[in-house]
Amino acid sequence: MDAFFKDRAQAEHILQEWVRRREPVCELDIRDSGGVYAKTPLQRGTRYGPFPMKLSHQPNDPQLAWKAHSRHYNGWLEPTEDVSTWLKKIRSVQDDCIGEANLQSYINAGYLWYETNRYVNAGSEMVVDGRPKSPVQLNEDFMNGGKVLAAAAAAAAAVVAASSSGAKSGGGGSSAPSDDRSDRDNGSLYSGDEFSKDKKNSSLIREGDIDFTDDENGFDIRCEVCDKVYPDLDLLDDHLIGAHHFKQDEFPCKQCALRFCHRPLLIKHEAISHNNIRKYSCENCSKVFCDPSNLQRHIRAYHVGARCHPCPECGKTFGTSSGLKQHQHIHSSVKPFACEVCSKAYTQFSNLCRHKRMHATCRMQIKCDKCNQSFSTLTSLTKHKKFCDSTGPGPYRNQHVNRHHQHPHQHPLPHQPHLAATATSTCPAPPRESSESSSSAAAAAVAAMSTPPNPFLMFRTAPSFFPGFPPYGFPPFLPQNPLHPTNIPMFFSKNPMDLGCGGPEITSPVSAFDQKLPFGFLKGENSESQAYDKVTEKELVFKAEEKLKKEPLVQAFEGEEDESRSSLDIKGKLEDTRNDSKSEEQDDMKQEPERVSTPDQQQAEDDRKSIDIMSTPPPADTPSGGDGPLDLSICRKRSAGSFFTAPAEDNLMLHRFMPRLHEFEAERGQPLKMRKSHSSAESSTSQKSHKGSSPTPTPTASPGLTPSPSPPTSAGGELSSTSEGGAVPTMAAAAFAADHSALASGPTLPQTHPTFHPLLLEEIYRSGFPFLCQPGGRRGIEALLAGAASAAAPKRPLPPVKFSAGSVVGLKTKDRYSCKFCGKVFPRSANLTRHLRTHTGEQPYPCKYCDRAFSISSNLQRHVRNIHNKERPFRCELCDRSFGQQTNLDRHVKKHESEGNNFRDSPSSSGIAEREEYFDDIRKFMNRVYTPNSLAGNEGDTEEYPNSDDQSVNLEKDSGNFNNNSSNISNNNSSSGNNNNSSKAITISS
């Protein structure tokens, strides 16, 4: 036999003649009148062939011809003349009558084969599928005749195997039952159940049917990452482990001792070594492959845009690799998506979402500790806290603070998550808190994620001086948890009085509360304090003690453990506010006669406008301003251009860390005796730095030296213990009386502005402190730079800045858009509209290339980029693998990190470029030249920050009021100029 096959031409001729002369249709009845019928019942998968094919430039019968092409040839493949004579008699059908087809044709190794796709009864007519077929790719060996001998030998072996199997079954023909080559009709969708049934019928192909030279029956030993070809599976396995960091020996073979790092390699090994060959049919044509890689390459070459990611286990194809990975969880019995409430796991995320929609108890479990809003997953809570922490205290803040009052030593430190978990599991929780959380694990997770760990705050805070009061200690450099803000201004120290060093020793709750009072809480006006000099210290103490007996102590401090430090103290150190718009200033001028009538009415009108950022007024039965000394009542005066509006609560963190030191002494609210001890130079400097003081004592204008703060607020935005009349809590009166003499005798230091070097500002901003960059915009760093700019000329402060109503409304708009189906709250209406589509199922964004539709436009764009355009812009630097989405690349890089190789993360996701843009903005800001006119801007100029729809900062100039204030204080400012136009430019260079 070896000598016979040495002569290639002779062997080829003999084999071809043998195949040609053999009767191929012994089980078929070929009628002269037309038509081919089955003589005996035919099983599904019975094959007929091989029938020789020839190349031609123009086919004789287009119905039997196949389009063929190669690198240098484009033509047709058609059966030879001796075969085509009877093949023409087989009736063919197309789309209209495709259901009648029980026979299909295909080309294997250059030969034509026919195969039944269903059970055919005896006497039934054979009908072939005549729809257009995919072009045949001819390799160079076929064109050159180099492997024609091997193809003929394989075909002969197939015929011998078919004959032997037919003899055993009693047919004695050329048919051979085998696996179904068409698990679904051409162009139809895939059915996994049908495929599994067919695979159970017969999953093995005889060795004679395997032809490794053909693309359809061959196996592609190729790296799917870098597309390198290897001669055997062992070399490919070593390559994947060494070059692409696959886990070694993860998939063992059940029939031998070999192990592989990739499951497709195991499947190929079982097919090659153990003849366990699986079939992967093309959805768009009749081709069937033994290797999913060949099927994928076939789809990309001949069916552009179709799903080209087949599953190695079942053959189902997917449009993306991520969809295939999610599908493979079904075969691996891995259920990565588990419900956090009932611990039920699913293989697909959509099934988990459906489970949560059907079970209300699994939907709302984890609650935000700030606004008490419920979430179903920790991921949703984390996204919510990014928005929630940037705004003011929520409507449920009182409840949270009250719980801390009841258990002042039971809550763990915010920067120690392990202590949080321990305290949650061991300490008894209040009844309200236990009802809010479904499990201790969820509560511990919420407590642990309140704030990231702070390396500089590893010790417990100082013990409180009195029950109900927050601890009072030295200010740390870094901020604490927003839930436990500091009780004094931080970041840079001020004079000793600010740290409590110059005050008297705290021996009573009254003096303790005095330490908590904002230093600008006390009136110190030159024009009005003379009218109140008749009130002595004895009267102050007497009235305060009597009022203390009537009111309980808890009322004064209700909900102030956190708020007294975050809201009341900071508001007391801000400059006096001015109106939000010109219309409000005109209304103030119209209401001046009403305010002059009585001090109570005047205080009520002024305070009602000064606290316009608050939501609701307090009950009317609280004490009025007449019950306490007039020196202590808040009298909000408007000087027509020199006041700053109190910032919204989302800006309070910045003002806590960057206090204006030149206002501190003025905001102490010093009495008349203490004010007289100041030198004339000091008072003139203060008057120059606060333009807008009227020389005549009028009830509607107060000196710029003593801007009064806003009243303290509770968590819900309501006034804690201040009436509409603007009265101060009587506790404040007693506190001032107890400490009045000490304050009067305390030393006063000249105030200076803090000086910050530009490099220090950039370094501080680079470190990523949370109070320097706010989520709604970057107003924090702008205000910081503005404060540094004013240090160059302390006698000429920047013009007043007015905050628009958008920053005020921003505190409440986050509760405005709620879902009527699940109660979820969104900050903007667009977010709510997009969320409602998850309940209604609306998909208003259809794809123009396919029949898919999406509820979100970004998902449609991503679908077009990844599926139809095949864009892969994100590349892994470690293994050169490309991805269509950044999240997929990040997930892929994490796999590298989890293998213990400590690879760095993708540079595209590190945010380096974004931070550099921030630094460029800082440098541009610091290189500007600021004057009062240039900073104030033209009339109506506004500056809007990105990602801040509800909050904006309007820089407007009230020229009339500004010039009026300048003329009022021209006598005191003669040394520095008569008006604001004489101000010199302040240049800040980096």
From Swiss-Prot:
Residue ranges crossing the lipid bilayer per the database entry: none
GO molecular function, one term: DNA-binding transcription factor activity
Ranges of compositional bias, category Polar residues: 900-911
Gene Ontology CC entries for this record: nucleus
Biased composition (Low complexity): 416-427, 683-695, 960-983
Compartment(s) where it occurs, according to its Swiss-Prot or TrEMBL record: Nucleus
GO biological process entries: dendrite morphogenesis; negative regulation of cell population proliferation; neuroblast fate commitment; Notch signaling pathway; regulation of dendrite development; regulation of DNA-templated transcription; regulation of transcription by RNA polymerase II
Zinc finger (C2H2-type): 221-245, 251-274, 280-303, 309-331, 337-359, 366-388, 817-839, 845-868, 874-896
Biased composition (Basic residues): 400-412
Keywords, sorted A to Z: Developmental protein, Differentiation, DNA-binding, Metal-binding, Notch signaling pathway, Nucleus, Repeat, Transcription, Transcription regulation, Zinc, Zinc-finger
Ranges of biased composition (kind: Pro residues): 696-712
Tissues and organs where the protein is expressed, per its UniProt entry: Expressed in the developing peripheral nervous system (PNS). Expressed in the ventral patch in the cephalic region of the embryo from stage 5, and continues in cephalic region through stage 15. Expressed in the developing PNS from stage 11 to 15, with a transient expression in each PNS cluster. In the ESOP lineage, it is first expressed in the IIIB cell, and in both ES and th cells, although it is only transiently expressed in th cells. In the ESOP lineage in the adult, it is also expressed in the IIIB cell and inherited by its daughter cells, as in the embryo.
Biased composition (Basic and acidic residues): 564-597
Location (main, coarse): nucleus
Pfam families in UniProt: zf-C2H2, zf-C2H2_6
Chain segments carrying region Disordered: 164-196, 392-440, 554-633, 667-725, 892-913, 933-990
PANTHER family: GASTRULA ZINC FINGER PROTEIN XLCGF49.1-LIKE-RELATED, PR DOMAIN ZINC FINGER PROTEIN
Other comment: Was named 'hamlet' because of its 'to be or not to be' role in ESOP cells differentiation.
Annotated function: Transcription factor that plays a crucial role in external sensory organ (ESO) that elaborates from a single precursor cell (ESOP cell). Mediates the differentiation of lineage branch that generates the internal 'ES' and 'th' cells (external sensory neuron and thecogen cells, respectively) from the IIIB cell. Its absence leads to re-specification of IIIB daughter cells into external tormagen cells (tr cells), or internal multidendritic neurons (MD cells). One of its role in the development of the ESO lineage is to modulate the activity of Notch and PAX2 signals.
Name recorded for this polypeptide: Transcription factor hamlet
Lineage of source species: Eukaryota, Metazoa, Ecdysozoa, Arthropoda, Hexapoda
Gene: ham
